[in-house]
Amino acid sequence: MRRQTLPPEALDDTDRAILNRLQEGFPLTPRPFDDAGAALGLTGAQLIERLERLRAIGAITRFGPFYDAAAMGGAFCLCALSAPQADFDRIAALVNAHPEVAHNYARDHALNMWFVLATATPEGIAETAGRIEAETGLTVWRFPKLREFFIGFRVAA
């Protein structure tokens, strides 16, 4: 399924504050939603409700921790394939059915589907890419990480 760009009015000032603040971290406390919500002037329940809405409208695809698979003996790999436009959504569903797929994005390029694999072992990258190739009949191009970059995400408040 392709994601659509949200109109600016889809997010209010509170939504934008939530997105910006939670990029900075999340409290590791007995009641983290209460504590994160308080920093935003919300109750924990209101924060959860907002996060559920942001996910429902496609402003976020998930909410949860980001684990460094490589630091735990696993691996990450950026992958791409060239999916026929007429079959794009079906192929995306096959790719996304793999729990190792962390992100999947459509791009205007010959390699029009880009996704990240995160596996428990370095060998898992080749194994998962091979399963995706077998299921889709398409070549999965692998672009392993050479250097790590941290890109900050901010929305205009």
Curated annotation (Swiss-Prot):
Q: EC number(s) per UniProt?
A: 4.1.1.111
> Which residue windows are coiled coil?
none
User: Domain of life of the organism in this record?
Assistant: Bacteria
Q: Does the keyword Translocase apply?
A: no
Top EC category: lyase
Reactions that this protein is recorded to catalyse:
siroheme + 2 H(+) = 12,18-didecarboxysiroheme + 2 CO2
Check the record and name the InterPro entries matching this protein.
AsnC_trans_reg2, HTH-Siroheme_Decarb, NirdL-like_HTH, WH-like_DNA-bd_sf
Family from the record: Belongs to the Ahb/Nir family.
- Sum up the protein's function in the record's words: Involved in heme d1 biosynthesis. Catalyzes the decarboxylation of siroheme into didecarboxysiroheme. Siroheme is probably decarboxylated to monodecarboxysiroheme, which is in turn decarboxylated to didecarboxysiroheme.
Q: How does it assemble?
A: Forms a complex composed of NirDL, NirG and NirH. All proteins are required for the total conversion of siroheme to didecarboxysiroheme.
Q: What is this protein called?
A: Siroheme decarboxylase NirG subunit
Record organism:
Paracoccus pantotrophus
